[in-house]
């Protein structure tokens, strides 16, 4: 269980000073994560002078920054010149925190500092496409999507992929939707040549593998894994149930190459894109559908009155041109693309869901 975060902003003489305390803390924490300062503090504490030697940071600079974090109760001190961990600072020695915090900090603040200028140019409206996003504008690539930008930054791209891999377990694959009907349908002799399941933009097949293992009646040879060509090349090395799955490179916004499949499954993809782009993705699938095809969208759902965490994530995703969506949002986008929303299977704990679309 992560520790609660100490906050002294309520002690500020004015709200503006409260935000100043928070801004300074955010910046110092970002630097200390980058320089691995938290990892160099032993459980018994350390002299700031010795910590300066271990980290290679000038003593005068380190003392000022550490003193602030002692004042803000991120650190504690037994006597002047000493610094000790608290549960909060100790948490930032963990790999998960060291990946997530810089990712959130860098992508949000790079964007937010440019919000006034971005919205002056683009109007006070949601980003209309991922290649015209606040993050791209703030990063100096105003015509590129976040994925195109990360391709230009190998270290950031590597850190991003590692961060996303950590979050895979936060959104369940199984336990919401009953996939067993797909395997039962596949037992019919007349459909032995039909594609049963297409995992659209499915990465290396983690979700598809979990589904095939949980529902062994679904025949792998009648399944397809799709993603960008470079991802598919890696996926071809898979063993186990994925070994005999067809691997097909795609352009997510181009023509869907697999026609007439029983199910098109798209997980953790649509929330990364604007409404117009989601409609484009779904229409490309709609054009490939048979009359009885279904589309399964596995995504996080935004409640009509979202709690603070989900509302914050939604605003953060705005920077990339994406958004968290509620049931009504998905229903409206489905209709624009030529589908009807037929059912929703939800996980109340994680606010995840599988939305089933049928051809309208």
UniProtKB/Swiss-Prot annotation:
Function as written in the Swiss-Prot or TrEMBL entry: Methyltransferase; part of the gene cluster that mediates the biosynthesis of varicidin A, an antifungal natural product containing a cis-octahydrodecalin core. The PKS module of pvhA together with the enoylreductase pvhC catalyze the formation of the polyketide unit which is then conjugated to L-isoleucine by the condensation domain of the NRPS module. Activity of the Dieckmann cyclase domain (RED) of pvhA results in release of an acyclic tetramate. The cytochrome P450 monooxygenase pvhE then catalyzes the oxidation of the C21 methyl group to a to carboxylate group.
Record-listed S-adenosyl-L-methionine binding positions: 201-202, 227, 251-252, 267-268
EC number: 2.1.1.-
Record family assignment: Belongs to the class I-like SAM-binding methyltransferase superfamily. Cation-independent O-methyltransferase family.
Keywords: Methyltransferase, S-adenosyl-L-methionine, Transferase
Annotated gene: pvhD
The keyword RNA-binding belongs to this UniProt entry's keyword annotation: no
Protein name listed in UniProt: Methyltransferase pvhD
A single MF term (Gene Ontology): O-methyltransferase activity
């Amino acid at each position: 269980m992560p520790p609660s975060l100490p906050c002294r902003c309520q002690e500020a003489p004015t709200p503006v000073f409260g935000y100043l305390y928070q801004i300074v803390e955010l910046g110092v924490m970002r630097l200390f994560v980058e320089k691995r300062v938290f990892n160099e503090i032993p459980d018994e504490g350390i002299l700031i002078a010795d910590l300066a030697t271990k980290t290679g940071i000038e003593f005068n600079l380190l003392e000022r920054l550490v003193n602030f974090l002692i004042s803000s109760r991120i650190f504690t001190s037994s006597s002047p010149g000493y610094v000790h961990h608290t549960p909060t600072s100790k948490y930032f020695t963990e790999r998960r925190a060291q990946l997530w915090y810089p990712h959130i900090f860098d992508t949000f603040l790079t964007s937010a500092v440019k919000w006034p200028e971005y919205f002056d140019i683009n109007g006070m409206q949601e980003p209309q496409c991922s290649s015209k996003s606040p993050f791209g504008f703030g990063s100096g690539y105003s015509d590129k999507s976040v994925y195109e930008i990360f391709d230009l930054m190998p270290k950031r791209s590597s850190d991003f992929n590692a961060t996303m891999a950590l979050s895979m377990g936060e959104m369940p694959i199984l336990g919401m939707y009953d996939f067993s009907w797909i395997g039962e349908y596949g037992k019919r002799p007349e459909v032995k040549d039909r594609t049963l399941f297409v995992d659209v933009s499915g990465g290396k097949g983690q979700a598809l593998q979990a589904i095939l293992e949980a529902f062994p009646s679904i025949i792998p040879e009648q399944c397809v894994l799709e993603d960008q060509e470079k991802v598919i090349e890696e996926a071809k090395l898979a063993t186990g149930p994925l070994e005999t799955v067809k691997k097909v490179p795609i352009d997510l916004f181009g023509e869907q190459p697999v026609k007439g499949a029983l199910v098109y499954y798209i997980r953790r993809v649509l929330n990364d894109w604007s409404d117009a782009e989601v409609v484009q993705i779904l229409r490309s699938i709609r054009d490939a559908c048979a009359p009885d095809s279904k589309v399964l969208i596995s995504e996080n759902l935004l409640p009509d009155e979202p709690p603070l965490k989900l509302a914050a994530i939604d605003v953060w995703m705005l920077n990339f041109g994406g958004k968290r969506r509620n049931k009504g949002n998905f229903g409206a986008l489905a209709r624009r693309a030529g589908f009807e929303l037929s059912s929703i299977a939800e996980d109340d704990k994680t606010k995840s869901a599988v939305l089933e679309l049928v051809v309208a």
